[in-house]
Every structure is written in C-alpha cells, then in structure tokens.
C-alpha cells in the first residue's frame, strides 16, 4: 500500500490530493477568480495560494482520514506554470516533506494530467490531446517518453478562449472557458474565422487578433451576437484540434484518444472528437471537471507512479521551472 500527497498550484487553482494505490481519497481545491475583463497576475495568484494552501491540506487529510505518518511520499508540481504560484506551493511541499520526514517528488504538470486521465478512464495507450490555458499538445507514448507530435506554435487554446472572454467582459466565475461554452450553445450564426493548421501544429494568435479586432464592429452593427462569436470561435478552434489529433492517430496507428487539461471538460470538444473517433472506429476517453481541471490528485497519481518506480527528488534539486516540456521526462514506470 502506497499513499502519496500531491500539491498542485501552477496557475489559478490550488489543490491538494491524496492517492492510495489508484484510489482518490480526497481532492479539494480552491480557485483564484478575478473580475470580468481581467486575467490573473502571478503575484496575486501566489498570494491567494499562500493564504489557503494549509486549509486545503487540512481538508484533504480530514476527508481522506489519513494521518501524516500514513503518507509514503509528498509530490508537488515542478512545472511548467507561473513562477510565483509554483514557488509558493513548492516551498510548502518541501516544508511538509521535511516536517513529516517523507521523500519528495517534483512532478511535470502535463504528466500529471496524462496519468490521471489514464487512471480514471482506463485508456491503455492513447493519443493524448492536452489542452489548457497554458498548453496545447498532441502526445503519444513511445520508448519511455511522452513524445509531442504536434503543438501550438504560439498561444494555448485555453489562453485564446480566456483572452476573448476578456474582450466580451465575460465572467471568470467559475471560469471564462466554461462561460464561453454556455454562451456558444445559444449561438446560431457561424462567422468564418482564420483557420491555421501546419502539419500537426496549430496557431491561435491570428484567430484571436482577428476576432479581437472585428468583434466590436460586428456586434455594434448587429451582424452577429456575442453568442454567435463564442459559437464560431469554439467550432473553429476545436476543428483545428480534431484535425491534428486525427493526423497524429494515423501516424501512430492509435485507436484511442484521451483528452486532458482544463479545456478537455468542454462537452462540444468531446462531441467533435467523438465523431472523428467513431468514423475511424476508435475510442474516446475524457474526464469531468473533477480531474480535467488542475487538481492535486493528478500530481499525487503521477508521484505515485514515479515513487513506485524508485524515483525521488533530493531537497537540493527540488526547484521549480516555468518551462518544463512533457518530452523531457523519462517515463520509467511504463513498459
């Protein structure tokens, strides 16, 4: 029996999760929410995390009925992410590991998403679409590495959605992406937007610039509604993602797709990916908001896999990094 506590705080979510041999014992989190039209600053986000991380840890321990002496390892997000929030959480994880006299493990944020998705859905060897506010990658496992076959060449798909939400002054509660999804369901007119796919890579900065420039004119003239723009943006972005995922599946000979990351909660994205998979005779796997959105349990699960494979992070090496690519990690726990 192996129990791992995981700390996640790479962006505006702070979470602590506890995993015991593939079972999620607890997974509380808090979200830093800013007013409509605003993003979240690293310093303010870090301040939020510092103010509530111990309460979240206490909640996780109480919910799981786990005591410090029961824990085998403490895992934390090493990166990628926002520097100040990452550092705040890493300091707490280091302190907890020393107080409890437990080994420490630095975990790649993306690997956490993948391993949590595999655990929850039962996907065996899928092509992974990782879509969030900071990342957009198409990934597949090969020779002890999660290899990136396609990715954004500029901004992430979630960042594109978030920044457009600011243009329309859409609420950030519970998240701008979720609120865009709800508005898109009411859209009736499709507005043609730039579509940029280069092989298995995508670009979202052009479509964002275009819709930012044109939205005021379109809305003021009555040419379309905010709901129409949300609908059009979603359809265009998600079509691009489905295209590069299918291309990666064909390249890898894969019959499974796993969608992870915060944008992976979007039901419309899952529907569009499902249509493609059905036409290919493939299976689609996705999780709900409990595990798609950043959470501590995913870091605990990746830490559990790493710890069982004999990995630990020395205290002097327990730094954080804002840039930490998925394919930099040697996946020692898979055949």
Swiss-Prot record:
Biological process, per Gene Ontology: tRNA threonylcarbamoyladenosine modification
Protein name: tRNA N6-adenosine threonylcarbamoyltransferase
Upper lineage: Eukaryota, Metazoa, Chordata, Craniata, Vertebrata
Function: Component of the EKC/KEOPS complex that is required for the formation of a threonylcarbamoyl group on adenosine at position 37 (t(6)A37) in tRNAs that read codons beginning with adenine. The complex is probably involved in the transfer of the threonylcarbamoyl moiety of threonylcarbamoyl-AMP (TC-AMP) to the N6 group of A37. Osgep likely plays a direct catalytic role in this reaction, but requires other protein(s) of the complex to fulfill this activity.
Organism from which the protein derives: Xenopus laevis (African clawed frog)
Entry-linked Pfam families: TsaD
GO cellular component: cytoplasm; EKC/KEOPS complex; nucleus
Predominant subcellular localization, coarse grouping: cytoplasm
Subunit record text: Component of the EKC/KEOPS complex composed of at least tp53rk, tprkb, osgep and lage3; the whole complex dimerizes.
Binding sites annotated in the UniProt record for substrate: 130-134, 162, 177, 181, 266
InterPro entries the record matches: ATPase_NBD, Gcp-like_dom, KAE1/TsaD, Kae1_archaea_euk, Peptidase_M22_CS
Its EC number(s): 2.3.1.234
Catalytic activity: L-threonylcarbamoyladenylate + adenosine(37) in tRNA = N(6)-L-threonylcarbamoyladenosine(37) in tRNA + AMP + H(+)
């Amino acid at each position: 029996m192996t129990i791992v506590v995981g700390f996640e705080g790479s962006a505006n979510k702070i979470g602590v999760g506890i995993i015991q041999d593939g079972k999620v014992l607890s997974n509380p989190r808090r979200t830093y929410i800013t007013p409509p039209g605003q993003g979240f600053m690293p310093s303010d986000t870090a301040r939020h995390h510092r103010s509530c991380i111990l309460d979240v840890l206490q909640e996780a321990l109480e919910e799981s009925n786990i005591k410090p002496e029961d824990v085998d390892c403490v895992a934390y997000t090493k990166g990628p992410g926002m520097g100040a929030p990452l550092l705040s959480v890493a300091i707490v994880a280091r302190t907890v590991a020393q107080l409890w006299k437990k080994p420490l493990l630095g975990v790649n944020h993306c690997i956490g998403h993948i391993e949590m998705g595999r655990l929850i859905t039962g996907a065996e060897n899928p092509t992974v679409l990782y879509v969030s506010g900071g990342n957009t990658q198409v990934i597949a496992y090969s020779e002890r590495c999660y290899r990136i076959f396609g990715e954004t060449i500029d901004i992430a798909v979630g960042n594109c959605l978030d920044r457009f939400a600011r243009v329309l002054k859409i609420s950030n509660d519970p998240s701008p992406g979720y609120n865009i999804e709800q508005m898109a369901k009411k859209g009736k007119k499709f507005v043609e937007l730039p579509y940029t796919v280069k092989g298995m890579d995508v670009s979202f900065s052009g479509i964002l610039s275009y819709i930012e420039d044109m939205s005021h004119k379109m809305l003021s003239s009555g040419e379309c509604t905010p709901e129409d723009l949300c609908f059009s943006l979603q359809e265009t972005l998600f079509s691009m993602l489905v295209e590069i995922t299918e291309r990666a599946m064909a390249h890898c000979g894969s019959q499974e797709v796993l969608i992870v990351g915060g944008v992976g909660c979007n039901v419309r994205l899952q529907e569009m990916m499902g249509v493609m998979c059905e036409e290919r005779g493939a299976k689609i796997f996705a999780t709900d908001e409990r595990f798609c959105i950043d959470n501590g349990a995913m870091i605990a699960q990746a830490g559990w896999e790493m710890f069982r494979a004999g990995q630990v992070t020395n205290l002097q090496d327990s730094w954080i990094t804002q840039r930490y690519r998925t394919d930099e990690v040697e996946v020692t726990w898979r055949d």
